[in-house]
Each structure stands twice: as C-alpha cells, then as structure tokens.
Amino acid sequence: MTESPQKRHLGQGIERQNEQYACQGALSTIGMRIRQSVDRGYQVSGAAPAPAARTAASCVQDNSELTIPDYKRVPMPSSKQAPMLVNSRTVSSSSSLEMWENQLDERLEHIDNDIMRNKRAFEQVEDW
C-alpha cells in the first residue's frame, strides 16, 4: 500500500511511419523553426548586425514623408476676422436650465394636484 501511484498508458502509441520523402522530417519541424526565427528576430547565424542596423531593419517602413505633406501655416491677414468658435449652429439657445426647472416645478405641482383629487377618505370606501 505504500507504493507510489504510477500513470499507465492505456492506449497504443502511434507507430512511426516510413518517410515517403527525404525532407519529411524537416517539414514536420518547420513550424517550430519559424517560431524560433521570429523569437530571435530573424538573426542569421554569424556576426550580429550593429544595434542601429538591427533596429532599422526590424521597424516598419516609414512613409510619412511621402504621405503627409509639409504644410506651412500662413498668418491670417489683419483685415479678416477670425472665425467664431461658437455660432448659432453649434449652440442652441432655445432651452436653458432655468426654463427646464420652471417646467419641472409646474409638472410636479400638477402631479400633486391630481393625486390630491384622486384620494378618497375612509368613509368614501365602499369595499368594506
């Protein structure tokens, strides 16, 4: 009873098949070799490149000089007025917090009046 438990293999293992092609063994490990190359940063065996060259080679190509032209800001003539930051289309003046509060007070008062009219006194209840 003091024996340590051991795992037993219940199934049958897959037998190694004969290679149909000479490179079949190399193809079976290509996924792992690709992952290792990516992990190493595509460094080829031999002398390691300089850090600056390694960084430049691993960066994505920068096309910002071609796609983003250099715009030069020209000052506005003094005869023209700067555009308004706020105008009638960006701000609505038809409503304000004060108007909303007044309407809220009126609505609450109307609700209170309706509730007071709908209440019945104890004597008016005929269900008893």
UniProtKB/Swiss-Prot annotation:
Q: Where in the cell is it found?
A: Cytoplasm; Nucleus
Provide the disulphide bond pattern. none
Q: InterPro entries, from UniProt?
A: RNR_inhibitor (IPR013900)
Q: Which Pfam families match?
A: RNR_inhib
Family designation:
Belongs to the DIF1/spd1 family.
Q: What is the lineage of its organism?
A: Eukaryota, Fungi, Dikarya, Ascomycota, Saccharomycotina
Region annotated Disordered sits at 70-97
* GO cellular component terms given for this protein: cytoplasm; nucleus
Give the highest taxon in the source lineage. Eukaryota
Protein task: Mediates the nuclear localization of the ribonucleotide reductase.
| Name of the featured protein | Damage-regulated import facilitator 1
Keywords, A to Z? Cytoplasm, Nucleus
Record keywords: Oxidoreductase included? no
